[in-house]
Amino acid sequence: MKALHFGAGNIGRGFIGKLLADAGAQLTFADVNQPLLDALNKRKRYQVNVVGEQARVEEVKNVSAVNSGSPEVVALIAEADIVTTAVGPQILARIAATVAQGLITRHQQGNTRPLNIIACENMVRGTSQLKQHVFAALSEDEQIWVEQHVGFVDSAVDRIVPPSEAGSTDILAVTVETFSEWIVDGTQFKGQPPEIVGMELTDNLMAFVERKLFTLNTGHAITAYLGQLAGHQTIRDAILDPAVRQTVKGAMEESGAVLIKRYAFDPQKHAAYINKILSRFENPYLHDDVERVGRQPLRKLSAGDRLIKPLLGTLEYQLPHDSLVTGIAAAMSYRSEQDPQAQELVTLLAQLGPKAALAQISGLPADSEVVEQAVSVYNAMQQKLAH
């Protein structure tokens, strides 16, 4: 199995790339970070530190790397059996032209073996969005050929992979938690789905996508935002603060009530899933910084993301949402000198005021009760910070 993975960052190396390599794939990473590519090509291997109760070091072998802007990538797509990505939602559109060129070359070479493309991003149906960008760069004839021979497979991914420790001397080493979940839409494959241990097939992907988004992502973000407000440095410190924990757990229970209503989840099993996630946030071996987890607040406050989407579900089913609203107010309070979106958020709040700013970012009606509530909590948070 020939595999090409876009994104040689921590998630690429520590999660998706690792599962592909473990499955015996001939794996090539595509990235723009030249020192990283040089190190991968020189060593052909790297270490993954799996941390938890039983820490272990695993080695990923027989890997290579190419620059994602190079002609080699096009040639690899023309030959690959599987193409995966972990580049971040914003970058997906940027790699689409390269993917399209690879598919055109594949067509020209007469390669009719099935190819499956799986975007492994923190977004809802990311591969379907990638497909739209790719198809925009294809002629009608090429689109027809691609529809026949290429599967665009949506997925849900879950593994906490913090950045490398400061002072780490090995550019390739990566630290990951023990837990990992990669769920793919089994209905979207062309040909037989590849056998990859750790990749689960489902015919009801949206239930898993929203379960993860509404629980892990919602909880992680709110832990970060409330943690920063309370002066905590790491996710672990924040979630061990009883006040933060109460709101985070409350928000996950509120979003969970939406999932139970929408997908008929078992309430007891979902409660256990929430507790499992809280224990993952407490992992003493993961040093995950609240400022890192909170970054890109404009994206995280957008209509389809981890804060507003579950809130919209509570409004749809007339369910409680006080903790989610507190989380939204905390996201509005996020500040970071390192994050351009945090700077933009501050500008919007100053120019428009909190009410109009939240409405513009989230798509919620400015005069809605829920926006009034979020602004009221936000103002109280700002007053508290001022004293």
From Swiss-Prot:
GO terms for biological process: mannitol catabolic process. It catalyses: D-mannitol 1-phosphate + NAD(+) = beta-D-fructose 6-phosphate + NADH + H(+). NAD(+) binds at A3, L4, H5, F6, G7, A8, G9, N10, I11, G12, R13, G14. Its EC number is 1.1.1.17. It holds the Pfam family Mannitol_dh. The keyword Transmembrane does not apply. Keywords: NAD, Oxidoreductase. One of its GO terms (molecular function) is mannitol-1-phosphate 5-dehydrogenase activity. InterPro entries: 6-PGluconate_DH-like_C_sf, 6PGD_dom2, Mannitol_1_phos_5_DH, Mannitol_DH, Mannitol_DH_C, Mannitol_DH_CS, Mannitol_DH_N, NAD(P)-bd_dom_sf. NCBIfam families: PRK02318.1-2 (NF002646), PRK02318.1-3 (NF002647), PRK02318.2-2 (NF002650), PRK02318.2-5 (NF002652). PANTHER family: ALTRONATE OXIDOREDUCTASE-RELATED, MANNITOL-1-PHOSPHATE 5-DEHYDROGENASE. Belongs to the mannitol dehydrogenase family. This is Mannitol-1-phosphate 5-dehydrogenase. It comes from Yersinia pseudotuberculosis serotype O:3 (strain YPIII). The gene is mtlD.
